[in-house]
Amino acid sequence: MQIHSLKYPLIELKGVNVTFAQKTILSDINLTIYPNSIMTIVGPNGGGKSTLLKVLLKLLPATSGKVIYSKNVVIGYVPQNIYLDKSLPITVEKFLSLRKGTHKQDIKDALTLLSIGHLRLNAMQKLSGGEMQRVLLARAILNKPNLLVLDEPTQGVDITGQAELYQLIKQTQQQLNCAILMVSHDLHLVMADTNEVLCVNQHICCAGSPEAVSNDPVFIRFFGNQFAKNIAFYTHHHNHKHNIHGDICCGQDFRSTQCKHKIN
């Protein structure tokens, strides 16, 4: 019996395909998101990562296949970025209050949790990249989600702030007791806490623990041998592993498939 056979999935994708104008964007995607897990999606630009998130968020219908949601799943979403009209200044508090059913205390609590209470009355247009991402994260947790979906959460954040932001995301996950699904190229920063990595290029090319994926030939062809070695080094020095459900377990890999794509 698997360690977490009693945990019910938050979301399951079964044989999901997405096509536009007879062009395949996603092919035969199968994945399961469990409570309290952290799953990171990597892959080349144009490989379908953002499309996969849109399907999960019900922003785009799958051409075929099934997307099954737990009846109690509550999703918070952090996009890569948002467009704000500079001619219409708006404070952080006003921006967050645009979410239906939000109360001032909810806003204060979210900002306090993310250590940005001092930004409450600041203009959104004057925020730095890191501050903006924290505000978007605050907006995502207003509905107290049990699944946070993050699309390149360090977009627009300088290098020194990226590790700090990922640490804040991890702390938020622990506070909310939620799962995280994120698209990220910063695997060297998130790998210690990631339970499963999915490498997506139209289909799932390889998947498993960060250490397992870093040794997969497909991953190495995508990201380079030195980058893969760095990931393997970091994971080797992490003092334990987690399975995809978030539990400490003995060394084991999950799944790895041979990618049909050729990479020049």
From Swiss-Prot:
Topology within the bilayer: Peripheral membrane protein
GO cellular-component term (any): plasma membrane
Gene3D superfamilies from the UniProt entry: P-loop containing nucleotide triphosphate hydrolases (3.40.50.300)
Top EC class, one word: translocase
InterPro entries the record matches: AAA+_ATPase (IPR003593), ABC_transporter-like_ATP-bd (IPR003439), ABC_transporter-like_CS (IPR017871), Metal_Ion_Import_ABC (IPR050153), P-loop_NTPase (IPR027417)
Cellular compartment(s): Cell inner membrane
Cross-referenced Pfam families: ABC_tran
SUPFAM superfamilies according to UniProt: P-loop containing nucleoside triphosphate hydrolases
Protein residues bound to ATP: G43, P44, N45, G46, G47, G48, K49, S50
Reactions mediated catalytically: Zn(2+)(out) + ATP(in) + H2O(in) = Zn(2+)(in) + ADP(in) + phosphate(in) + H(+)(in)
EC number annotated for this UniProt entry: 7.2.2.20
SMART domains: AAA
Keywords: ATP-binding, Cell inner membrane, Cell membrane, Ion transport, Membrane, Nucleotide-binding, Translocase, Transport, Zinc, Zinc transport
Molecular function (Gene Ontology), one example: ATP hydrolysis activity
Domain ABC transporter: 11-226
Coiled coil: none
GO BP terms, alphabetized: response to zinc ion
Principal location listed in the UniProt entry: membrane
Function of the protein: Part of the ABC transporter complex ZnuABC involved in zinc import. Responsible for energy coupling to the transport system.
Family: Belongs to the ABC transporter superfamily. Zinc importer (TC 3.A.1.15.5) family.
Annotated PANTHER family: METAL TRANSPORT SYSTEM ATP-BINDING PROTEIN TM_0124-RELATED, ZINC IMPORT ATP-BINDING PROTEIN ZNUC
Subunit structure: The complex is composed of two ATP-binding proteins (ZnuC), two transmembrane proteins (ZnuB) and a solute-binding protein (ZnuA).
Protein name: Zinc import ATP-binding protein ZnuC
Protein's organism: Histophilus somni (strain 129Pt)
